[in-house]
């Protein structure tokens, strides 16, 4: 799947990105390269291959799951500008 300039402009608009007209050919080319790589990876036959979370069979040494900090929720909420029912109230930031 190859992207055209109009596709990149639409994606940029949906993502609220401001792109220069001079940058569009480079960005279109870069996105097409990425999509080409994805197409190559999807073309590989992976039937019978078990998915890996990590290429090496190693176990991680994890620390004990122990509480290390005290609950300061009440103290933090007492200095917050606005709290309701135990939740912090913040101004709307997305249109």
UniProtKB/Swiss-Prot annotation:
It is an enzyme of class 6 (ligase). Keywords: ATP-binding, Ligase, Nucleotide-binding, Protein biosynthesis. One of its GO terms (molecular function) is glutaminyl-tRNA synthase (glutamine-hydrolyzing) activity. It holds the Pfam family GatC. It catalyses: L-glutamyl-tRNA(Gln) + L-glutamine + ATP + H2O = L-glutaminyl-tRNA(Gln) + L-glutamate + ADP + phosphate + H(+); L-aspartyl-tRNA(Asn) + L-glutamine + ATP + H2O = L-asparaginyl-tRNA(Asn) + L-glutamate + ADP + phosphate + 2 H(+). Belongs to the GatC family. HAMAP family: GatC. Allows the formation of correctly charged Asn-tRNA(Asn) or Gln-tRNA(Gln) through the transamidation of misacylated Asp-tRNA(Asn) or Glu-tRNA(Gln) in organisms which lack either or both of asparaginyl-tRNA or glutaminyl-tRNA synthetases. The reaction takes place in the presence of glutamine and ATP through an activated phospho-Asp-tRNA(Asn) or phospho-Glu-tRNA(Gln). This is Aspartyl/glutamyl-tRNA(Asn/Gln) amidotransferase subunit C. The gene is gatC.
């Amino acid at each position: 799947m190859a992207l055209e300039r109009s596709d990149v402009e639409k994606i940029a608009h949906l993502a609220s990105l401001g792109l220069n007209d001079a940058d569009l050919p480079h960005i279109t080319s870069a996105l097409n390269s990425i999509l080409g790589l994805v197409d190559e990876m999807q073309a590989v036959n992976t039937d019978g291959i078990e998915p890996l979370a990590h290429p090496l069979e190693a176990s991680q040494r994890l620390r004990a799951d122990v509480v290390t900090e005290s609950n300061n929720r009440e103290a933090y909420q007492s200095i917050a500008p606005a709290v309701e029912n135990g939740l912090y109230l913040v101004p709307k930031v997305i249109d």
